[in-house]
């Protein structure tokens, strides 16, 4: 594990008036590829502490969809993403783990906020089960505590975001999980685009900020949908909540 800290961050100058910009969290991000790398950048700009897992290294093909630079090709994705956020002016605390995530990686951690950007349904399911078990086992819950599980799924021009903030969301989300064998593999030259990954990541961070703001205000006026579907071919973004 490696980390980086510089407490003199000035990356929030233009938005520090928002309440969410001054409520920094520990965020656990599984994956540093398509959406994971962009989400890590956007959350680092705010100043959150990032915990980022990925065993793979950036390759030339990743330049077409992921937040990486030619100078970090061949470097582990988690460590490279941290380095790339530094190149873009971020100096938040950023922990990296150059291994595939498994349950032991969350041991003894306050894993309240988990964002799954894994390319494996198996890891998505296991990460969710760990997060759910951790949440349900709590006996003394802090009213100001943030409890969020986010799952991102993406193709070259479409994307889905599942944002779980209630026990009802947990039950609904379980029905969306399937095995890796059931997943449909897209052709190599139709798998990912930079603008789709960055747009999806932007929506994730916007909803994350809304949830933080609602929690701080004590009332829920900003939208935090359970499911968001994005299609760049039809230019549609459709949201639905557990009550729809």
PLM region descriptions:
Residues 1-15:
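S-adenosyl-L-methionine
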Residues 2-5, 21-24, 109-244:
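Glycine-rich phosphate/adenylate-binding loop
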Residues 18-20, 68:
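Glycine-rich phosphate/ribose-binding loops and adjacent secondary-structure elements
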Residues 25-47, 51-59:
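Glycine-rich adenosine-cofactor-binding loop
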Residues 30-31, 53, 97, 116-119, ...:
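Short His-Asn-centered micro-motif
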Residues 52-90:
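Glycine-rich phosphate-binding loop and adjoining beta1-alpha1-beta2 segment
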Residues 89-95, 145:
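A short helix-to-beta-strand connector/capping loop
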Residues 97-105:
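Conserved SAM/SAH-binding loop
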């Amino acid at each position: 594990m490696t980390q980086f800290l510089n407490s003199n961050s000035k990356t929030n100058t233009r938005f520090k008036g928002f309440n969410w910009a001054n409520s920094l969290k520990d965020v656990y991000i599984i994956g540093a590829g398509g959406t994971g790398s962009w989400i890590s950048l956007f959350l680092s700009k705010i100043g959150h502490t990032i915990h980022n897992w990925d065993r793979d290294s950036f390759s030339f093909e990743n330049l077409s969809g992921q937040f990486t630079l030619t100078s970090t090709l061949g470097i582990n994705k988690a460590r490279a993403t941290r380095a790339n956020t530094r190149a873009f002016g971020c100096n938040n605390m950023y922990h990296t783990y150059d291994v595939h995530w498994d349950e032991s990686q969350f041991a003894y951690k306050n894993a309240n906020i988990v964002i799954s950007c894994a390319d494996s349904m198996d890891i998505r399911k296991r990460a969710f089960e760990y997060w759910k078990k951790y949440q349900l086992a709590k006996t003394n819950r802090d009213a100001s505590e943030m409890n969020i599980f986010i799952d991102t799924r993406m193709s070259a021009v479409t994307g889905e975001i599942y944002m779980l903030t209630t026990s009802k969301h947990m039950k609904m989300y379980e029905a969306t999980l399937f095995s890796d064998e059931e997943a449909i593999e897209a052709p190599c030259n139709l798998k990912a685009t930079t603008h789709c990954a960055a747009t999806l990541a932007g929506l994730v961070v916007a909803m994350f900020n809304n949830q933080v703001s609602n929690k701080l205000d004590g009332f829920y006026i900003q939208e935090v949908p359970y499911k968001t579907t994005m299609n760049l071919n039809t230019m549609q973004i459709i949201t639905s909540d557990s009550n729809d």
